[in-house]
């Protein structure tokens, strides 16, 4: 189905030499030897032999290559690194509490995630979210808030292969309007921590996706590194509108979004 489009994706080695001394702050735990690596242009994909991920590595790699290109273009990044994606067979194997989980390690341009059936939007979204953490942090440095760190990774989702980006976020905002926290609450790290995780992630992603679409990424880059207090103080001068006005404009847009 996509073999001709992936002539550049090659099996580099049957096994990967174990890596020692990796701390979780800088990369995945020390690797065992039971991996196969498939090399792409911008992504090296590590999979378990015979796994669901290996059976679908061409499409998974295609999604990540597209996401890499999209994120760099949207944020106008100079980043030209190479990602290392580790696909685990279960949350337990990756030391996560569920199968819907991943973790990024920007210092080593790597991330790990759980790849389980079905092949589709949820898996692509999870994988792309973690990849975006690496690309964004290595391209811009670390964000000043949880709001920006987690929200932007989903706000930047390319929809070439799925509809888990804007076509999900804006209708979700409309249907959950009564439960939405204020953006000022999410920008504050304390308020973020008191908000249900799913609501915090989706609300912030929706707002930031709209902000990029409406006002461009250059202004967003200015608020990206600011801490909670700085962002709340400076967002009006950077955007020419106070946060409350931006939030109201976003909600009207989502209410009228037709896809």
Question: What are these language model-derived features?
Answer:
Residues 23-25:
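Bacterial signal peptide processing site
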């Amino acid at each position: 189905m996509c073999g001709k489009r992936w002539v550049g994706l090659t099996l580099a080695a049957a096994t990967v030499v174990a890596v020692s001394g990796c701390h979780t702050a800088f990369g995945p735990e020390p690797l065992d030897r039971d991996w196969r690596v498939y090399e792409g242009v911008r992504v090296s994909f590590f999979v378990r032999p015979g796994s669901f991920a290996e059976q679908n590595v061409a499409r998974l790699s295609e999604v990540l290559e597209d996401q890499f290109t999209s994120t760099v273009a949207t944020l106008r990044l100079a980043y030209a690194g190479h990602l290392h994606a580790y696909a685990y067979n279960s949350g337990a194997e990756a030391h996560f509490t569920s199968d819907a989980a991943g973790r990024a390690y920007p210092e080593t341009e790597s991330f790990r995630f759980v790849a389980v059936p079905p092949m589709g939007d949820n898996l692509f979204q999870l994988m792309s979210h973690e990849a975006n953490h690496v690309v964004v942090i290595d391209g811009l440095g670390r964000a000043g808030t949880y709001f920006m760190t987690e929200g932007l990774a989903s706000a930047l989702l390319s929809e070439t292969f799925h509809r888990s980006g804007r076509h999900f976020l804006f209708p979700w905002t409309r249907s959950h309007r009564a439960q939405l926290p204020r953006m000022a609450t999410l920008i504050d790290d304390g308020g973020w921590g008191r908000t249900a995780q799913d609501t915090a992630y989706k609300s912030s992603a929706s707002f930031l996706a709209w902000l990029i679409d409406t006002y461009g990424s250059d202004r967003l880059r200015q608020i990206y590194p600011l801490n909670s207090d700085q962002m709340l103080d400076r967002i009006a001068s950077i955007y020419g509108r106070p946060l409350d006005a931006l939030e109201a404009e976003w909600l009207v847009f989502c209410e009228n979004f037709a896809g």
